[in-house]
């Protein structure tokens, strides 16, 4: 659930999640109730293993935080989010800062002027991040030394980790 994703982001072992105190936690939950904050969750059977959350405003999504309990599951969440935003006609995904982790997916730094232009353009849109959607796939595989694929870290006995967007209460 949305609350579970924020709680996981807030309890990250590194210090990046420490900014999410009780007041901020409840504020984001209120935004979720109002239909403005959303999460993407990665599940292995009934266990939440990764995810992210952010806030939408018209044609922009402002990513706030992400977490993973199983290697690469935050990457699965990010890829699912980008696909969802593209399908929904969103024009801006604000990641706050570009890390090597995000750069591998095509994230780039842009100038303040370009950001403000893209933000203004995205405010002219009326995009919706409605309803739950899910994606179920086969096991997540890692290449072995010979270049083939043979292991499935974090996959369930069914071999099908899944990603889904949680609906807001308004959806």
Feature locations, PLM:
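N-acyltransferase acceptor-side catalytic subdomain
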Residues: 1-171
